[in-house]
Amino acid sequence: MSWLDKLLPPKIKQTDPKSRKGIPEGLWVKCPSCEAVLYRNDVDANLHVCPKCDHHMRIGARERLDGLLDPEGRYEIGQEIVPVDTLKFKDSRKYPDRLKEAMDETGETDAMVVMGGAIHTLPVVAACFEFSFMGGSMGSVVGERFARGAQNALEQHVPFICFTASGGARMQESLLSLMQMAKTTAMLTKLAEAKLPFISVLTDPTMGGVSASFAFLGDVVIAEPKALIGFAGPRVIEQTVREKLPEGFQRAEFLLKTGAIDMIVDRRKMRDEIAQLLALLQRQPADALA
C-alpha cells in the first residue's frame, strides 16, 4: 500500500451485482402529453388522469367500471360468451392466434365487459370497451354482450350506460362484425320504447363502426376531454380530401362546439355527473344520491 492510499478514505466496497435490488418495472409512468414522469400509484389513484396536465390516459374496462359502480351488488353479464373463428379468417396471422395473444395480454376473453350494479345506489347496467383487446374492435361477442346488457336493463327496468373505446368493426369477422352495428342499434330502440335512459360516454378513441352505430344514440352523449372521435382517422381524411384539417378536428372539444355531443366530463367527476343525470332522467328525489 502506498503512502497516498493510506491518506485516502477507505473505498466503498462493491456489492455483487446479483444481490443489488433494482427498481421494479412499471413503477413510473410517463405522461404522453406533458411528458412528466409520474408515480404509477398516484396515476392509478387519479383514475389514469395526469395530475400535472389533466391528460386522460387510456384505462382498462374493469378499472373504469370499478371507478363507476358501487362496490356492493355487482354482477357480470355475458362473460361466458367467447369468440370463435367461424370464417377461418387469416391475414398475416390466423385469427385464433390473434385472439390468444389478446387474451394472454389483457386477461379478458373479448373487447367488452358488461356489469350490472348501482351508481350512488341508483341501479344500472354498464358496458365498457377494452381497447387493449384487439383495439377494442367490435365483433360478434361484443355485439352479443352489448345486446345482453341492454336486455338485462330492459328486464330490470334500469338505465343502460356504455363507455366506448374502439377502432371500429373487427375485420377478422367480416360481415358478422358489421351485423353488430344493426344488432346494437336495434336493442337501443327497445330501450327507447321502454322509456329507459341510455347514456353513451365516448372515450379515446371512438372510431369506425362503433361511432357509426350506437355511440351517438344516447339520450345524453358525453365525451372525455380531448378524446378522438370520428369515423375515419384524420390522416385518412387528409389523404382523401387533400387538405389540411383544422386543429383539434375530431376531438371532443370540436364536437361539443359543433353540437355533435352534449357535454365533456372529466373522468374524476364522471361517476357523480352520471348519477345526477340518471336522477334527473328518472325523476329521482335529490336525496337518492346521498
From Swiss-Prot:
Pathway: Lipid metabolism; malonyl-CoA biosynthesis; malonyl-CoA from acetyl-CoA: step 1/1. It is found in: Cytoplasm. Zn(2+) binds at C31, C34, C50, C53. Binds 1 zinc ion per subunit. Its cofactor is Zn(2+). It is an enzyme of class 2 (transferase). It catalyses: N(6)-carboxybiotinyl-L-lysyl-[protein] + acetyl-CoA = N(6)-biotinyl-L-lysyl-[protein] + malonyl-CoA. Pfam families: Carboxyl_trans, Zn_ribbon_ACC. This is Acetyl-coenzyme A carboxylase carboxyl transferase subunit beta. The lineage of its organism: Bacteria, Pseudomonadati, Pseudomonadota, Betaproteobacteria, Burkholderiales. The gene is accD.
